[in-house]
Amino acid sequence: MAIQTSTKFSRVTLSYHPPVAHVSLQNPPLNVIDIAMMEEMAEALVEIEARPDVLVIVFAGSGKHFSAGVDIAAHTADKVEAMLAKFHAVIHLLVSSKKVSIAAVHGHCLGGGAELALVCDLVYTAESATWGFPEITLGCYPPVAVTALAGVGKYRAR
């Protein structure tokens, strides 16, 4: 079957080569996850989940990096609640998916980008990848998705 690419998104590229769906983060140069990207990722995950011909979801970043995390501009008092709700929706859709999810990590994988990768079923990471949670140095709460999964649960549960 030929590769099918969805053109309805601007912050992610969604393509299908059944049984695999590819979701590529598209916000160069660092693939910072802004609210618009969160909304598109959630919409893409709902679309993917509805397709019986897709068994695997592969997340990757375009260019040189997976993702440098969530947009710092979304961490303000007037935006953080909405941002967290949208990001948690993405995490929930991914964790509750019946599809196998894989993060293909290269370059920077920081903050929310690392959270996104870590909630996938498998993480394939380049030896040169840089992982971290720099939001802690800004006084932001440590990664919610990672603490919510609490190490033991997800990988033993599947």
What are the functions of these language-model segments?
Residues M1-S62:
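Conserved CoA-thioester-binding segment of acyl-CoA-metabolizing enzymes
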Residues V23, F59, D71, L116-L118:
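Hydrophobic/aromatic residues within transmembrane alpha-helices
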Residues Q26-P28, D78, H108, I136:
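Short strand-loop junctions, especially beta-strand C-caps/beta-turns
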Residues P18, G61-G63, V70, E127, ...:
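Short, small-residue-rich loop/turn micro-motifs
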Residues N31, A73-T76, G132:
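Nucleotide phosphate-binding site architecture
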Residues S6, V95-R158:
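Crotonase-fold acyl-CoA enzyme core
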Residues M38-E39, D53, G61-L93, C109:
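Glycine- (often His-adjacent) and acidic-residue-rich active-site loop
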